[in-house]
Amino acid sequence: MKIKIQKIHPNALIPKYQTEGSSGFDLHAVEEVVIKPHSVGLVRIGICLSLEVGYELQVRTRSGLALNHQVMVLNSPGTVDNDYRGEIKVILANLSDKDFKVQVGDRIAQGVVQKTYKAEFIECEQLDETSRGSGGFGSTGVSKA
């Protein structure tokens, strides 16, 4: 699949996959940002893109940032719809007790292109019964069976 990219910032980098088997490609910051402890920050990527109809871009946390710095994409996965043409930006949450400094060019998130499907919603009076029913939020427990 070919994705058209428009660079709208001089520091913008065209995304690329780091390995042959990578599902995600890196998204790079175009300006310095300091995210205070237990706060969020908006990081500019400096690109706009055009996805084919039927696809979305998911913006996901990089595992190294989560493990080593307690920094994550707040709405992970963030969704970039195929009809959006504005700049890609990433909401990062700093869960640590220290400032997190984003430098120009830092790989701050990863993007994954996913196929999307349109559902048809049908109103009904009652749903099919299941053994689980309406149990949720821990209703199945956490211990091994």
From Swiss-Prot:
Give the residues the record marks as binding substrate. 62-64, 75, 79-81, 89
Swiss-Prot/TrEMBL keywords: Hydrolase, Magnesium, Metal-binding, Nucleotide metabolism
Q: Which family does it belong to?
A: Belongs to the dUTPase family.
Tell whether Transit peptide is among the UniProt keywords: no
Its pathway?
A: Pyrimidine metabolism; dUMP biosynthesis; dUMP from dCTP (dUTP route): step 2/2
- For this entry, the protein name equals Deoxyuridine 5'-triphosphate nucleotidohydrolase
Q: What does this protein do?
A: This enzyme is involved in nucleotide metabolism: it produces dUMP, the immediate precursor of thymidine nucleotides and it decreases the intracellular concentration of dUTP so that uracil cannot be incorporated into DNA.
Annotated source species: Helicobacter pylori (strain J99 / ATCC 700824)
Q: Which PANTHER family match?
A: DEOXYURIDINE 5'-TRIPHOSPHATE NUCLEOTIDOHYDROLASE
